[in-house]
Regions:
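A short, Lys/Arg-rich alpha-helix, primarily the initiator
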Residues: 1-21
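Residues in the recognition helix of alpha-helical DNA-binding motifs
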Residues: 14, 28, 39, 69
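The alpha-helix within a helix-turn-helix
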Residues: 15, 26, 56
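Recognition helix of helix-turn-helix/homeodomain-like DNA-binding domains
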Residues: 30-46
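Short, charged recognition helix plus adjacent turn
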Residues: 38, 67-80
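Short, basic-rich loop-to-helix N-cap that marks the start of a DNA-contacting helix
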Residues: 43-57
Length: 80
């Protein structure tokens, strides 16, 4: 799994745990829904750490908690 796929899956996982819609997350994180949807649909080549931090703020979690998931354990090599 690529890093961007893992980020997308983690966002969906966290929203599902909190019964939170993407639009609600966007509102609480201060980003547009299209920003999140582009991260989820792999249109964003590199979801930036600032965007991820805003989502973490909207989810009321730390960056460490965001990346504390088995999804990030065996990521494929990004340098080809």
């Amino acid at each position: 799994m690529s890093a961007k796929e893992a980020v997308a899956k983690r966002i969906l996982e966290l929203c599902e745990e909190r019964n939170m819609a993407i639009n609600a997350l966007a509102s609480s994180a201060g980003v547009s829904p299209s920003t999140i949807y582009s991260m989820l649909n792999s249109k964003s080549q590199n979801p930036g750490i600032v965007s991820i931090k805003k989502l973490c703020d909207g989810l009321d979690i730390s960056i460490r908690q965001f990346f504390d998931s088995n999804l990030f354990d065996d990521l494929e090599q990004e340098i080809k």
